UniProtKB/Swiss-Prot annotation:
This is Major pollen allergen Pha a 1. Residues 1-29 form the signal peptide. PROSITE patterns: EXPANSIN_CBD, EXPANSIN_EG45. It holds the Pfam family Expansin_C. Glycans are attached at residue 38. The keyword Nucleotide-binding does not apply. Residues 187-268 form the Expansin-like CBD domain.
Amino acid sequence: MMKMVCSSSSSSLLVVAALLAVFVGSAQGIAKVPPGPNITAEYGDKWLDAKSTWYGKPTGAGPKDNGGACGYKDVDKAPFNGMTGCGNTPIFKDGRGCGSCFELKCSKPESCSGEPITVHITDDNEEPIAPYHFDLSGHAFGSMAKKGEEENVRGAGELELQFRRVKCKYPDGTKPTFHVEKGSNPNYLALLVKYVDGDGDVVAVDIKEKGKDKWIELKESWGAIWRIDTPDKLTGPFTVRYTTEGGTKAEFEDVIPEGWKADTHDASK
């Protein structure tokens, strides 16, 4: 699957120094920190340890284009509102972790509030600095601070924190959405799946044409995008069914209309 690397260019010099130390240490025979076990769709009270950095503008949503390796767009706007982050390998899971939600909290430095925030995974990072690493948007990173002390927290550059996976709860009125991606045509359909309540992430997507009984399985393309290549014309309308990591299935009847066009239908029902 196609992957993009999350940039941390706006983190403090402390983070840059830490990364240089990792690379220098590796050259001297010191192993990089290996990733932890994959985080799955299990929920509870247990908190795990992680490190966090930030990237992009200090109060921004991370990527310059407000997108990321999951394929989402406008993550600076509702319902994400910039509360986003890049997960390392056991969190991003080669795109299977896109859309999953996590509570994060920090207790040091003193500017940390100690209160949990909730972030959505929208991007990927490969920095080998901890078994679990969240590279957050500047806005999300600062949100872990006491009111008025956001710059003090961002100034730390890198934080030790605790995290746990939680179920995603989107604002009332937010519905799962299927965006027909650019490049789609009658023989190729690519769907971006987003705003999934509960587990947040999707592990399977199928479509069924109106009047037919057979479900057609889509393949993973990259991030949260699923695709099908077929010699048969895809005319629609199509019912879409997704399966989340925890096994929840949901169907959306005729959500892709007849005569659909690429990059024109951001459809939800």
